Amino acid sequence: LIKDFTMTQFAMVFPGQGSQTVGMLAELAAENPLVEKTFAEASAALGYDLWALVQQGTVEELNKTWQTQPALLAASVAIFRVWQEKGGKMPAMLAGHSLGEYSALVCAGVIAFDEAIKLVELRGKLMQEAVPEGTGAMQAIIGLDDASIAKACEESAQGQVVSPVNFNSPGQVVIAGNKEAVERAGAACKAAGAKRALPLPVSVPSHCALMKPAADKLAVALEKLTFNAPTFPVVNNVDVQCETSAEAIRSALVRQLYNPVRWTECVEFMAQEGVTSLLEVGPGKVLTGLTKRIVDTLTAAPVNDPASLSAAL
């Protein structure tokens, strides 16, 4: 998969929801006009000022999933463009966590940025519509093995939906589904020996079976988009594969919405392919923090402000 390997032993990874903060990228934007220019392109596609929302909006506004998703996509693409402008080395591979997979596909030239912005806004709206507010939930299960978590979910469902949805690292798995079933499963995980079962402050139970109706509608929108061949291999969440055909990439994005994010396996796959370090292209450092827990020989660093950018270049 990796062409000129001596040059590129690093991969870029792109974060998903939960990494957004009001005021993100302000420092980088102060020194690089390309950041606000990127957000202006996104704003034109959306019909509202996304940069103003990100810089001056409320946490509540930014955390609405149909606004979070375009904001994070624009942030990651802006950082990637600044990296390119500064002559940064090109990565061997890309991967993104959930929404971050869209950022990776834009940076790999698969989907046009303005179309991707509208697409992830729609993805957020469809996700929110699929589950009435207050009826879905997610919990992070800390310190329990995957098999025990899956068993706790199966035994707690009682005709409702609850399943593991993010395999973030060994000992850190997120479950999602109907609120009551998630509460039962969280309690069952604790009874089985989990250190913690932490309710997450989200309104949408992502990547579980409740998202299937949203995925069916997303598929219709994806059919209308032009997909180009990727310039870098992009490891997808749902199959831990690098697809090149439009049809296969579309299918993976549709299935991603109601299937687990296999992040642990994505990082292991990149390491097996010879990647030795990860750069996290986006706000925050969630993925950087997970890296060593997955493959302890990998190094990782975030790139999102002038200091981290110059350190990585």
Regions found by a protein language model. Name each.
Residues 5-149, 200, 277-311:
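FabD-like malonyl-/acyl-CoA
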Residues 17-19, 44-48, 108-259:
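Alpha/beta catalytic cores of group-transfer enzymes, especially the acyltransferase/condensing modules
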Residues 84, 190, 271-274:
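Non-catalytic positions within long, well-ordered alpha-helices that form the structural scaffold/packing
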Residues 156, 311-313:
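Short amphipathic alpha-helix with an adjacent loop that forms part of the alpha/beta core around
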Residues 259-275:
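A short, acidic, amphipathic alpha-helical segment used as a generic capping/interface helix at domain edges
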